[in-house]
Amino acid sequence: MAKTVVKKNESLDDALRRFKRTVSKSGTLAEYRKREFYEKPSVRRKLKSEAARKRKKF
């Protein structure tokens, strides 16, 4: 979990910007979006295969 301590004489906007950066770097939101709904293993395999095919195409 991302943790940000507000430094002395630091504005709230700067602290929020720093927090958002740490969250995005840690991948917390991406992981949340990925696990928001249950995905059957067969569907997961299908999506993975399609993504690989798409990458190979380009």
UniProtKB/Swiss-Prot annotation:
One of its GO terms (biological process) is translation. It comes from the Bacteria. Keywords: Ribonucleoprotein, Ribosomal protein. GO terms for cellular component: ribonucleoprotein complex; ribosome. Gene3D superfamilies: Ribosomal protein S8 (1.20.5.1150). The keyword Acetylation does not apply. GO terms for molecular function: structural constituent of ribosome. InterPro entries: Ribosomal_bS21, Ribosomal_bS21_CS, Ribosomal_bS21_sf. It holds the Pfam family Ribosomal_S21. Belongs to the bacterial ribosomal protein bS21 family. HAMAP family: Ribosomal_bS21. This is Small ribosomal subunit protein bS21. It comes from Lacticaseibacillus paracasei (strain ATCC 334 / BCRC 17002 / CCUG 31169 / CIP 107868 / KCTC 3260 / NRRL B-441).
